[in-house]
Curated annotation (Swiss-Prot):
Phosphorylated at Ser-575, Ser-669 and Ser-687 by CDKAs and CDKBs. The phosphorylation occurs before metaphase and inhibits the interaction with NACK1 preventing the transition to cytokinesis. ATP binds at I86, G87, C88, G89, A90, F91, G92, R93, V94, K109. A motif (Nuclear localization signal) lies at residues 645-659. Induction: During the M phase of the cell cycle (at protein level). The lineage of its organism: Eukaryota, Viridiplantae, Streptophyta, Embryophyta, Tracheophyta. This is Mitogen-activated protein kinase kinase kinase NPK1. Interacts (via C-terminus) with NACK1 (via C-terminus). The modification Phosphoserine is found at S575, S669, S687. SUPFAM superfamilies: Protein kinase-like (PK-like). Expressed in root apex, lateral root primordia, cotyledons, shoot apical meristem, stems, young leaves, vasculature floral meristem, floral organ primordia, stigma, style and ovules in the immature gynoecium.
Length: 690
């Protein structure tokens, strides 16, 4: 009996559970079923004499054989801290967070979880599925998608940790800056297709591409957000009653609305709608239909959304390939990346914004470039348009191409550069050369809603060419151009054949003559009005005193050297006639002369020339202005004397009338009350009209 109990005890303590299935003979074999039942009943009882049976361990698996998601699960959870709310969507709120271990900024998307008993279990199941999907999405990495970092549960909510993008979404940028120019749309579309191609190759549909789900950083790099797990978030939020379709139907493909089954081509439709949103600033169909009406219209119509008319032919063709009604007719993201709208092949043959060259004055006329200008018609180009810069030792501009400009500076600021004007040295002033400017004027339709900072034109022609009016021998300039050409100046003779022309519809010389004449005419009118205002008695007296004081003595009429030195002549700058002529000559020269350097150098060169040539050049102008001033002075003197005579007559009549009134008042007043009579006479004198 004692041996039997000992054998049973040894079987219970030392026998492994795997040995019961071997069918071995002996005591263990005979009592295998009994011992197993006895051991299980003892373990379930409250006695707790025997320990729990040992469960065999699984065979060890090397770390290299683990799948990627299993290896990722070994990473420690992120310790984070929630900050301020930075966004609120249809299915949750987004907060800014920080990784307290590394200091990295995070975006935390908070999704509510149902807490009532009826849907609690279903909500927990959705939460587990969402966590598993986020663990899979953590392995995705691309420059144009937002990285998933993990999940964290809280009471009543699930937090999804995402990469933080500081710039904001495309929809927020549209609200701040308005619709984008086509160059920006092209750059964003290319990055959008690259990120979408990566997702499609990994078998992930986005399902909700729109401007609000495309984030932009401070360097213009876009990142797709809310992909993959968005469907699970919608299902989880639907259970809590937070589901909303506001804003979403405008980007939905027809097959998604009809629920006939959709694939990756539904994302391509949404890409086309997003391009229309960037080009117009508003979603497609939003001007015609509300959300519910848009759902019905998109599901039943056979037409695509309206394409903006201001887009180029390449962009319109790109949109037609995205917005095909039949899903199988839409191009894939990989094919669309080869489209000319994305590759910008149509712009490689010509400069993007402006062209230029480097050259010396000798060979500058042999080079050309075309830059078409769009200017308001009443703003005619003049010499001042070149900012009065007229040296020609080196002309410097730059050529900007799209591939060189992307990512380096904002495309909206390329036009704001000093390279657009020709810079020349002051020491190389040209006698005998002219700068002629005119503009190719366009109709108002050509520059409607044109912003040179945001919508740079691609074809601005500008031609620097040798003027056909000038020859190498000599340049015959008219008097109205106010340019004095010395006959014996060897300093700048090698530059006589150089000129700049900006051709227009009519002749450049005619344009220049008309412009100069109009400026001189306007200036003369203005000065004539100023002269009339200055013709006062004080001015006449001052002018007469100057004439008397400036009369030379008879001794100095024969020889200039015999003029006495003690005569008090007024300074030349104080003489009205000379001051006016100096103003007029300066203004006329400023209308055609390129820079202030012109005046100083012209005077220095005139000093070494023959005096007779200078007198011949200045004599017609002096005679003309002398006659004009004489006629105006006579007219002003006659009008002033006439006006003075009338004033004197009116004053005499008024005084005579007042004396008559006072005489009548004295004769009619009774001598009884002298004080009252005195008051009445004073009141009548104060108001003689009574």
């Amino acid at each position: 009996m004692q041996d039997f109990i000992g054998s049973v005890r040894r079987s219970l303590v030392f026998k492994q559970s795997g040995d019961f299935d071997t069918g071995a003979a002996g005591v263990g074999s005979g009592f295998g079923g009994f011992v197993e039942k006895l051991g299980s009943s003892i373990r379930k009882s409250s006695i707790g004499i025997f320990s729990k049976a040992h469960v065999p361990a699984l065979p060890s698996i090397s770390k290299a054989e683990l799948p990627a998601k299993a290896r990722k699960d070994d990473t420690p959870p992120i310790r984070w801290r929630k900050g301020e709310m930075i966004g609120c969507g249809a299915f949750g709120r987004v907060y800014m967070g920080m990784n307290v271990d590394s200091g990295e900024l995070l975006a935390i998307k908070e999704v509510s979880i149902a807490m009532n008993g009826a849907s609690r279990e279903r909500a927990q199941a959705h939460v587990r599925e969402l966590e598993e999907e986020v663990n899979l999405l953590k392995n995705l990495s691309h420059p144009n998608i937002v990285r998933y970092l993990g999940t964290a549960r809280e009471a009543g909510s699930l937090n999804i940790l995402l990469e933080f993008v500081p710039g904001g979404s495309i929809s927020s940028l549209l609200g701040k800056f308005g619709s984008f120019p086509e160059s920006v749309i092209r750059m964003y579309t290319k990055q959008l297709l690259l990120g979408l191609e990566y997702l499609h190759k990994n078998g992930i549909m986005h399902r909700d591409i729109k401007g609000a789900n495309i984030l932009v950083d401070n360097k213009g790099c876009i990142k797709l957000a809310d992909f993959g797990a968005s469907k699970k978030v919608v299902e989880l939020a639907t259970m809590t009653g937070a589901k909303s379709m506001k804003g979403t139907p405008y980007w939905m493909a027809p097959e998604v609305i009809l629920q006939t089954g959709h694939s990756f081509s539904a994302d391509i439709w949404s890409v086309g709608c997003t391009i229309i949103e960037m080009a117009t600033g508003k979603p497609p169909w939003s001007q015609q239909y509300q959300e519910v009406a848009a759902l019905f219209h998109i599901g039943t119509t056979k037409s695509h959304p309206p394409i903006p008319e201001h887009l180029s032919a390449e962009s319109k063709d790109f949109l037609l390939k995205c917005l095909q009604k039949e899903p199988h007719l839409r191009h894939s993201a990989s094919n669309l990346l080869q489209h000319p709208f994305v590759t910008a092949e149509h712009q490689e043959a010509r400069p993007f914004l402006r062209s230029s060259f480097m050259g010396n004055p000798e060979n500058m006329a042999a080079q050309r470039m075309d830059v078409r200008t769009s200017i308001i018609p009443d703003m005619r180009a003049s010499c001042n348009g070149l900012k009065d810069v007229c040296g020609v030792s080196a002309v410097r501009c730059s050529t900007v191409y799209p591939e060189n400009s992307l990512g380096k500076e904002s495309l909206w600021k390329l036009g704001n550069s000093d390279d657009d004007m020709c810079q020349m040295d002051n020491d190389d002033f040209m006698f005998g050369a002219s700068v002629k400017c005119s503009s190719d004027l366009h109709s108002p339709a050509n520059y409607k809603s044109f912003n040179p900072m945001c919508e740079p034109d691609n074809d601005w022609p500008c031609k620097f060419d040798e003027s056909p009016e000038l020859t190498k021998s000599q340049a015959n300039l008219h008097y109205d151009q106010a340019t004095i050409k010395p006959t014996n100046n060897p300093i700048m003779s090698y530059k006589e054949d150089l000129a700049f022309t900006f051709p227009s519809g009519q002749s450049a010389a005619e344009d220049d003559d008309e412009l100069t004449e109009s400026k001189i005419r306007a200036f003369l009118d203005e000065k004539a009005m100023d002269l009339k205002k200055l013709q006062t008695p004080l001015y006449e007296g001052f002018y007469n005193s100057l004439n008397v004081s400036s009369t030379p003595s008879p001794v100095g009429t024969g020889n200039k050297e015999n003029v006495p030195s003690n005569i008090n002549l007024p300074p030349k700058s104080r003489s009205p006639k000379r001051m006016l002529s100096r103003r007029l000559s300066t203004a006329i020269e400023g209308a055609c002369a390129p820079s202030p350097v012109t005046h100083s150098k012209r005077i220095s060169n005139i000093g070494g020339l023959n005096g007779e040539a200078i007198q011949e050049a200045q004599l017609p102008r002096h005679n003309e202005w002398k006659d004009l001033l004489g006629s105006q002075r006579e007219a002003v003197n006659s009008s002033f004397s006439e006006r003075q005579r009338r004033w004197k007559e009116e004053l005499d009549e008024e005084l005579q009338r007042k004396r008559e009134i006072m005489r009548q008042a004295v004769n009619l007043s009774p001598p009884k009350d002298p004080i009252l009579n005195r008051c009445r006479s004073k009141s009548r004198f104060a108001s003689p009209g009574r």
